Every structure is written in C-alpha cells, then in structure tokens.
Design a protein with these regions (language model features):
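Glycine-rich phosphate-binding loop of ATP-dependent small-molecule kinases
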Residues: 1-209
Length: 209
C-alpha cells in the first residue's frame, strides 16, 4: 500500500462534480476568491497537456477527447498531483493554514477516486451540482456558439451526459454513503446556487478566508 504524496495535515482536497454545463466553472471562480482554493480543472490540465510542446501524453489525450472517452486515470492523476506540487512550491498557503485544492471534474469514475486517494491525498468532501439535463444542454449549446470547443455540439453533449450518469454518479453515490457529499441543486441563478454552496461547505467546517 503506497503512502499518499500529500498529507491531510497540509492540504484539503475537495472534489467538485456536476454534469457538463452544471456551472462548475462559474462557481469555482467564486470559491477561489472567497475561500482561498486553488482551482484545478482535470479537463483544463488535459487540454493544456495535449498541446504542450514535448508532452509524452499529448497524442493519447487528443485521441481520447476526440472520441469522447475518459483518459486513462494514471495520466489525469499524474497531471493533478504535479499541479498540486507546483502550486505548493510557488504559492504556499498562509502560515498555519492548509492549502485548499478544488479539483473540478474529477474523479469521473470510482476507480479514479480510489487511485487518487491512495496515491495523492484523501479528499475532505465532494461538492456536487445537481442540474437537469435540459438546462445543461441549453447552457452548453449557448457556450458552443463562442467557445470553439470541439465537444460543445448536440451529439457530443448527449454522449457526455450519458458518460456522466453511467460513470460519475456512482462516485457521488459512494461518497454519499460515507457522508462526504455537499449536494446542491444547480438549476437556479448563479447567485442562489453559490449561497447554497457556501452554506454547504461552511457546515462542513470550511470557512471563508
């Protein structure tokens, strides 16, 4: 059994999950500003890595993203772990406080959660944005008009919904059994959702900084 790279005495990890278009990006920005989280998006790290000069994973990641499939977890976890180490080295938290990492869009499957917690760091909680598919689809199609992202089209969006329900919901359900989920309804205004998010994480002992 390997020892995790980081100790929960030094870092607090919150997994941030929700279907595509549930509003994680917007809420993440608020949490960074008010709670001192470092925001790590698994998707952003993968997208950056696929175009990084000399990347050993670039071609592999491109292929998986194009097919709408989940990238092998060893790759994603390595990128997250390295990003955490880099953040701690370049901008450590204030003395006497723990670094806070908001890991967005990860874990996408149960085995990823287990692998991350065994090798990188056990998580504090899972923040889950629960949003109806029709609301998410409308948001994503609107975003697709300007985002230039290959996967913001109707067919790809529905495929992503299916993948999320089949693979990521079991993660949420598993953490719920351990009483580690802050479950927020995410189909109202950004402000209202954020109020619920704040209330949920503060009830778990994470205060604003």
């Amino acid at each position: 059994m390997s020892t995790p790279r980081f100790s929960t005495n030094d870092v607090t990890v919150v997994f941030f999950l929700g279907g595509p278009g549930s509003g994680k990006g917007t809420q993440s920005a608020n949490l960074v500003k008010d709670y001192g989280f470092v925001h790590l998006s698994a998707g952003d790290l993968l997208r950056a890595e696929q175009v990084r000069e000399g990347s050993q994973y670039g071609e592999l990641i491109r292929e998986y993203i194009r097919e709408g499939k989940i990238v092998p977890m060893e790759v994603t976890v390595a990128l997250l772990s390295n990003a955490m180490a880099e953040s701690l080295a370049t901008s450590p938290p204030p003395a006497g406080t723990k670094a806070r990492f908001l890991i967005d869009g990860f874990p996408r499957k149960l085995d990823q959660a287990v692998f991350f917690e065994e090798t990188v760091c056990p998580s504090e909680l899972v923040l889950f944005l629960d949003c109806p598919e029709d609301v998410m689809e409308t948001r994503l199609l609107k975003r697709g008009e300007t985002s230039g992202r290959d996967d913001d089209n109707a067919a790809s969006i529905r495929k992503r919904f299916r993948t999320f329900v089949e693979t990521s919901m079991p993660v949420v359900d598993d953490f719920k059994k351990k009483d580690k989920v802050v479950w927020v309804k995410a189909d109202s205004s950004v402000e209202k959702v954020y109020e619920e998010v704040k209330a949920g994480i503060e009830a778990r002992g994470l205060q604003a900084r």
